Structure formats: C-alpha cells, structure tokens
C-alpha cells in the first residue's frame, strides 16, 4: 500500500513559522494540496518436481502462477511453466575410461516468465482527478477529469526462452568449457502507442502490442 498527502502555501511573512503553521500563509494555490492512495495486490503459487535416474538423467519441472490486480479482470492470472533436462555423460560406462575428461554434460530447458513493467496500479480503471476550479452559482467548484486513458484488456507480457548447452571439464576440471545457444521470444509486449484526441482524452494508450525475439550463443 502506498499513500501520500502534501500541501503547499505561499506568502508566509514570518520565517520563524516555517512549515509548522501553513495556515498563516497568505494564499494556498489550487494544486498545492493533494493526496494519493495505491493498493496493488499480487498473489503467487509455485510447485516444483525434480527427478534423477541412475545419477545420469535429470528432470526438473516447475509451474508458477501469478495473479495481479493491475491487469484486466479477464487476465488476472498468468501461468509460467518451465522444464529442464540434463544428461551426465561421464556416468556412462563407455566414457569412464577417458581419464582426461572429468565432466561432460548435455542440458536443455524451456521456460516462460511474466512482466508487468509499465502498468501502474489503476491503468485498467477509469480514474479521475481534479482539473481546476470554476464558478457555479457564484460558488467555487472543483472540476474533475480523467487521469489517463484506461485499458481494461491489459494482460501479462510473456517471455518464452529455450536453451541447449554442453559443459566439458578436462584434467580434473582444471579446464572447463561451456557452450550454449538460446532463443527467446516476448509476446503481448506492453507498449504505449499514439491514439487520436478525441475520442481519447490523452494521446497515449498502453496496450499489449507486438512481439520480439532474441537468440545468441
């Protein structure tokens, strides 16, 4: 939870009062007093299973679920599995006789992860704030307006990564060599794109747009 409150004033004639008596100021301009409240929530569950066969073959499977109040109601939960496999070839009989090789392992894995960067606590909701003061029937009245363009369909940005690699150790692991290739793809990327005003109140709208891939050694 994040809360805040701040006032400002102008025209305090006595410096001895400082901020201890803001009421002594000659004026308190509009916009000089404000407050905020944010209460985003995140719930997570996770499970993991590891299995090793003959001290040679290893399997690890995990699943994570994250639920956030910052995305749309239809996309609250994101589920992110991962799996990895490895083969310790040094445990094979046909390789044990090679004394110079102390380690030789092949491994591969796949996993998904989620990201909410760029989404504030209430981006999916239609929220308002004070805009100014106008006179209504000779009385000052505060007007209200939208804080930002809301998007109730926001969802998790997701990255999927696959990798395959090998580890080689020589001469009692005095020399260790590692080679790895990876490929990752990000989908439903969060991006603030240009929109017309009107019908929108502002010229930017945050949405899940596009994808991006990376690969390398």
Q: Which residues are covered by each model-predicted region?
A:
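Extracellular/periplasmic, surface-exposed regions of secreted and cell-surface proteins
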Residues: 1-217
